[in-house]
Amino acid sequence: AGFNLLICDPPQACAGQKGLVTLDELLAQSQIICLHTPLTKQGRHATENLINAQRVTGLAKGTLLISAGRGEVIDQQAVLERQQQHNDLHLYMDVWHQEPNIDIQLFGYSHCVTPHVAGHSLEGKMRGTHMIFQALCQHFDLHVSETLDSLMPAPKRAQLAISSNATAKQTMQQACNGVYPLMEDDARMRGMQNGHDFDGLRKTYPVRREFSSLQLRGIADAEISNMMAGLGFGVAVDTNTIKTQGPVNEL
């Protein structure tokens, strides 16, 4: 059981890294495909239109496609045409062509749509800001005393009690929704009147925390506990040792 993970990274492959596959090998062998490449328009490893019409056509029926890099990496029109004809791909779309003036036609053929917020967690923003702060301090030879952890505010929900008889799937659903109710973003996105509302969604995006901000309680199965820890959640083995940082909620 589990996943067989394939990774395609052409620049790293050229640098000699082992264990990577070509893009076409990955597309041919994968039932779940996650794209999070930057957009580069020139050079040997240009990513613009990387998933072109030919590759879109070649995707196996039932493929789950997560687009979380840049919109122009995928031929979105080819995806739309395939979905209009067959509607046989499971689409999770976070990035779009011509942001912020996007075409909303693909909404009706997607399982989940979000306004380019894959990197919008508070931790992600704070991490980037702290890196700039550290670089400035180093440049001006200033002493840095503040750590990133010391600057992070306490989460609104710090702990979540999981039913002791919950399955792995139930545990994952409860924990993920406890940090990030994904379908609320989807509902806001689908409420757009037109593509021009996209920028407003990003500017008014609510605070979102990462998995590491939430500690899980009550998991009785060691395998599930290890799985959730691997996803980045805090997992309390002994409830007597929990350090309370905020309210405890139970789903």
Model regions: which residues?
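Short, well-ordered alpha-helical segments in soluble proteins
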Residues: G2, C34-T37, F140
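Short, flexible coil/linker elements and helix-boundary hinge sites characteristic
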Residues: L5-C8, S30, D141, G232
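Short, well-ordered beta-strand core segments
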Residues: L5, I33, H111-V113
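Rossmann-like dinucleotide-binding domain for NAD(H)/NADP(H)
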Residues: G62-N226, G230-G234
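NAD(P)-binding Rossmann-fold cofactor-contacting core
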Residues: A1-Q17
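Rossmann-like adenosine-cofactor binding region
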Residues: Q12-I104
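C-terminal accessory region of SF2 helicases/translocases
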Residues: M228-G230, V237-L251
